[in-house]
Amino acid sequence: MGLLSFSSNIADAEAPPQLPAGEYKGVCTAAQDKVAASSGNPMLTLTLQIPSSEFPADFDPGEGVDAQTFTLNVVSRDIPADRWRMKNTCKAFGVPMSNSIDPNDFVGREARIRIRIGQDLEKNPRAEVGQVLPL
């Protein structure tokens, strides 16, 4: 593996600005069927991107940033609550619904992504996906 190079010393790096809470059009760029390390529950992990064209006019994401990337985990146990959440996720992206879902069907599809401000593990504010909705 090669060395990672940066234009400035990473010791001087500051936390990036957080995308403000709101609704943005975004696209699913990757989808994976996984098992949660902490609980052992099956889940669908979606990688969602919001392009800079959707950012508020007064939001400066920093030099060279053309999109914000988020991860959405949808627990997929075969219980009523998880089936309901999966239904709403499929509906948001226009993915066909049946008793089996192909994660690949999400890739390339768009939805409204509702961003909220949560906290990271160190209690710092962090933009995160609160909900996905149909366009």
Where in the sequence are the language-model features?
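Short beta-rich binding modules
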Residues: 1-135
